[in-house]
From Swiss-Prot:
Transmembrane segments: none annotated. Expressed in embryos, developing endosperms, leaves, roots, flowers and pollen grains. Inhibits papain, ficin, cathepsin B and, to a lesser extent, chymopapain, but is inactive against bromelain. Inhibits the growth of pathogenic fungi. Regulated by the DOF transcription factors SAD (activator) and BPBF (repressor). SMART domains: CY (SM00043). Induction: Up-regulated by dark and cold shock, anaerobiosis and upon seed imbibition. Repressed by gibberellic acid treatment in aleurones, but not in leaves. Not affected by abscisic acid treatment. SUPFAM superfamilies: Cystatin/monellin. A motif (Secondary area of contact) lies at residues 63-67. This is Cysteine proteinase inhibitor. Pfam families: SQAPI.
Length: 107
């Protein structure tokens, strides 16, 4: 896959369009990113009638699509036990749109 080469504003930033990339260092501590991860847990709880409690964001990856697909590894508490889950959230910030695409136990 090619880097953005023409007027997309991404040239020289190392962003690979369409490819899943590790987010910049420290992104797991970014408040907006944490809110998206909390959203993923809340959406999963609502859909699955679960009671997972967000603990922390462990890993963040992202993919530039029509918006941004965020790939999270999230530590949660379930009945007092800490567990890891993987979530995928699609966001189009300019439309105030976010949607949980996937939420599953980490492999």
């Amino acid at each position: 896959m090619a880097e953005a080469a023409h007027g997309g504003g991404l040239r020289g930033r190392g962003v690979l369009l369409g490819g899943v990339q590790d987010a910049p260092a420290g992104r797991e501590n970014d408040l907006e990113t944490i809110e998206l991860a909390r959203f993923a847990v809340a959406e999963h709880n609502a859909k699955a009638n679960a009671l997972l409690e967000f603990e922390k964001l462990v890993k963040v990856r992202q993919q530039v699509v029509a918006g941004c697909m965020h790939y999270f590894t999230i530590e949660v508490k379930e009945g007092g036990a800490k567990k890891l889950y993987e979530a995928k959230v699609w966001e189009k910030a300019w439309e105030n749109f976010k949607q949980l695409q996937e939420f599953k136990p980490a492999a």
